[in-house]
A protein has these predicted regions:
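Hydrophobic beta-strand core positions in alpha/beta domains
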Residues: 30-32, 64, 108-109
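Short, internal strand/loop/helix patches
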Residues: 75-113
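A short beta-strand-turn-helix
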Residues: 10-29, 55
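Conserved redox-active cysteine motifs that mediate thiol-disulfide chemistry
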Residues: 33-50
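Thiol-/selenol-based redox modules, centered on thioredoxin-like
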Residues: 109-144
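Bacterial N-terminal signal peptides
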Residues: 1-10
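Structural signature of beta-strand start/N-cap positions in the alpha/beta core
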Residues: 27-29, 59-61, 86
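Short pre-active-site segment immediately N-terminal to redox-active cysteine/selenocysteine motifs
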Residues: 27-29, 33-37, 103
Length: 144
């Protein structure tokens, strides 16, 4: 069974626009949950930067949701791990609860129809080709 991705109202920096998952219908979304204490998250950021750069023009949107309770920890992480994609802060865990995941990081690939199509628990560099193939398969599908 394929589920629709939950629509959420995230906590964003004061100068950011609200983020509505409905705004991304017709695009493929890589929604990644991460935390400052997560070592595999550090490894995933360069890959997400590269995939956002190469696949963004083809319709991929990368959104990384931070689940730290302390925003300063997330900001310190981002000073050392540059992000060329959207960052959302979820210190209360409201967004994370809607997606009900256990591992860190966890990525959800959401199809153009707004349904969760793939779930990747953890980040493993040796699986990057599979992550890429999953994204390409969704980008190749026609929008509803």
């Amino acid at each position: 069974m394929v589920l629709f991705a939950p629509i959420f109202c995230p906590i964003l920096p004061a100068n950011a626009e609200p983020l509505d998952m409905n705004a991304y219908r017709g695009k493929v979304v890589l929604l990644d949950f991460w935390a400052s204490w997560c070592n595999p998250c550090r490894k995933s950021f360069p890959w997400m930067n590269a995939i956002a750069e190469t696949m963004g023009p083809k319709g991929l949107v990368v959104i990384a949701v931070n689940v730290d309770h302390n925003r300063e920890l997330a900001d310190a992480f981002l000073q050392n791990n540059h992000a060329e994609f959207k960052i959302v802060y979820d210190p209360s865990g409201k967004i994370a609860k809607q997606y009900a995941f256990r591992d860190m990081p966890t990525s959800f690939l959401i199809g153009k129809d707004g349904r969760v199509r793939y779930l990747h628990s953890g980040f493993f560099p040796e699986r990057e080709s599979q992550y890429y193939a999953d994204i390409v398969s969704l980008l190749d599908q026609k929008a509803p």
